[in-house]
Amino acid sequence: GEMRSAEAYAAQEAARTGHGVLTTIHSNSSQATWRRMVTLCKRKHEMADDTLMDLVTEAFPVTVFAKQLEDKSRKIMEIMECETLPDGSRQYNTLYRFRITENRLEDGKFHIDGVHEAVSPISESLQKRFVENGMPQQELDRLMDSFEQKAPAESSPHAEGSAAAQTVTATDENTLQ
């Protein structure tokens, strides 16, 4: 179901204790989803923002950002991972994105064309988590192969708060583990 309030705290608790959790949340970007979850968790428990951010990024290391475009189509615009580094800082990695290749007005209607692109491979820590939670190595290898087919210059890990990580905006957000 959709997270709208204090149930965000229960969702992250369930996800961090081995339960599969799939939920949606409204926010303005893939990266903003984690901050929105922190805000919702604070409706239930008053904790430091950094502590709550640690909890929600551990519970939901990957967000899937969907948006309704001007032509009324819905697209997955971005899939992003948040990795907590050994020093406690966070790194946001865009894994996949939808790149608009053409935006045109035809017969009074908008038409948007684009392609989904692999951008940056998942972190070693998430790869390990996938395998430990039952992903067959063959599937992980297939996933990782999708990143090897892109140009290295397109890689885009961002440190927390970088401008490049905050450029995507939208009206809908889907978050899943």
Task: Give the ranges of each region predicted by the language model.
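Conserved P-loop NTPase nucleotide-binding/switch module
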Residues: 1-81
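NTP-binding/hydrolysis catalytic cores, primarily Walker-type P-loop NTPases
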Residues: 76-177
